[in-house]
């Protein structure tokens, strides 16, 4: 945390939040790192949970301190996940090119990140192809700030919204003079552009997404 503070990164609970711009297109980038499994005497590497937005793609990555043997036919790892006191669930996460972890990318990452927004802890078990297990339980204190930063940079909302919800938001934007076209419940480029214009008008970050702060400003509960 001392190094993160010196580097000017935000700190929220167990998370450090680094902001930058992509070299290829100047799009906003966020790397949020959960340090709750940090061990000062581990010189081989650290176990960490990383939520990030890089060049418009969201990822959630479980980083391990060992080199791992994945399922080469599926290029993935068997995972056991448990959020707070909920029943555990089985999943498969993609292997990393570094061979030191596994992750979810794109819409899969967005969906899972939404599911831990209000959680206090996350247990992960990664199983190598040889059966060796790697367990970690992360304290998620401060995760809402980290998740909102990642979602804002990649232009998605941390809320689980239905088609009817999106249609209602589009109707509100049209009524306020921010044209989305015919409200259809699909959050496409026209809706994103209209939302950005509204966000600028009320002094909010231009995410283009119906995020929590924007919906509160719109009067949507």
Predicted regions and their residues:
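A generic "folded-domain core" signal
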Residues: 1-176, 192
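Short acidic, glycine/serine/threonine-rich helix-capping segments at coil-helix boundaries
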Residues: 161-164, 174-221
């Amino acid at each position: 945390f001392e190094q993160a503070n010196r580097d000017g990164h935000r700190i929220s609970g167990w998370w450090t939040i680094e902001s930058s711009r992509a070299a290829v297109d100047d799009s906003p980038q966020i790397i949020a790192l959960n340090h709750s499994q940090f061990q000062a005497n581990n010189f081989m590497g650290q176990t960490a949970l990383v939520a990030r937005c890089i060049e418009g793609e969201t990822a959630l990555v479980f980083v391990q301190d060992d080199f791992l043997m994945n399922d080469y036919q599926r290029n993935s790892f068997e995972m056991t996940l448990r959020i707070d006191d909920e029943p555990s669930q089985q999943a498969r996460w993609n292997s990393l090119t570094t061979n030191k972890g596994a992750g979810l990318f794109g819409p899969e990452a967005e969906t899972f990140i939404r599911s831990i927004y209000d959680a206090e802890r996350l247990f992960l078990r990664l199983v190598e192809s040889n059966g060796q297990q790697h367990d970690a339980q992360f304290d998620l204190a401060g995760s809402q700030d980290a998740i909102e930063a990642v979602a804002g940079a990649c232009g998605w909302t941390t809320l689980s919204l239905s088609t009817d919800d999106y249609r209602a938001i589009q109707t509100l934007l049209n009524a306020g003079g921010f044209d989305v076209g015919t409200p259809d419940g699909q959050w496409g480029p026209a809706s994103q552009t209209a939302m950005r214009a509204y966000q600028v008008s009320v002094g909010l970050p231009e995410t283009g997404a119906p995020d929590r702060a924007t919906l509160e400003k719109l009067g949507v509960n």
